[in-house]
Regions:
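Domain-level signature for proteins that mediate thiol-based redox and metal-cofactor handling
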Residues: 2-193
Length: 193
């Protein structure tokens, strides 16, 4: 396990600007801030209140009864809600909350920061190629929608690739279409079995 790296310096900006972007998942909204929260390539998914215990921001966002998931990446926070409230009401409430959280100079993580797995780089050529396609073509599109995609495993015998979808992609009604039509087709074209 390695220590999480997030930008403490940038969190203490005097001018916090935040805007929201909708995502393909109608229950998720991406809240973008004007500073870097987490170093490039890292992300943190909090699917439950219990999983959010190391992050005061995620924990406090779960204080909104309708929040069901919180996700941090680079310069944005994706919040997923239930159907009890519409975004026309929830959006300004959450946006103001996030802005005030950072204006109050609260930390993104407490002293018990979540640990990340150390990834050993002993990948086969096929896996390196797959990860390259994920990084260059797929990850940027998924991040624009407020989500993240991570390589999970590749079975060379079966030709089966498993990925992990996080943030707005988790539970999104169109995620199966994204996987089948987008990712599967691209992998078949760019990575030969």
């Amino acid at each position: 396990m390695s220590e999480v790296k997030y930008s403490k310096e940038n969190l203490y900006s005097e001018n916090v600007h935040i805007y929201s972007e909708s995502s393909p998942n109608p229950n998720s909204m991406k809240f973008v801030v004007n500073f870097i929260l987490i170093q490039e390539g890292d992300s943190f998914d909090f699917p439950t209140l219990e999983s959010a215990k190391s992050s005061p921001l995620a924990t406090e966002l779960f204080g909104f009864k309708y929040v069901t998931r919180v996700f941090f990446m680079n310069n944005f926070i994706t919040v997923t809600k239930d159907d009890a409230i519409g975004w026309e009401e929830a959006n300004p409430e959450i946006r103001a909350f996030i802005k005030n959280f950072f204006l109050a100079k609260k930390p993104l993580f407490d002293e018990t920061q979540p640990e990340q797995e150390v990834v050993l780089n002993n990948d086969s050529e096929a896996v390196k190629k797959i990860k390259g396609v994920l990084d260059e073509y797929i990850r940027p599109a998924v991040e624009m929608d407020g989500g993240a995609i991570q390589f999970h495993s590749f079975d060379a015998q079966e030709g089966t690739l498993k990925v992990l979808l996080q943030g707005s992609c988790s539970g999104c009604p169109s995620s199966m279409i994204t996987l089948k039509a987008g990712i599967q087709n691209l992998m078949q074209r760019m990575v030969h079995k």
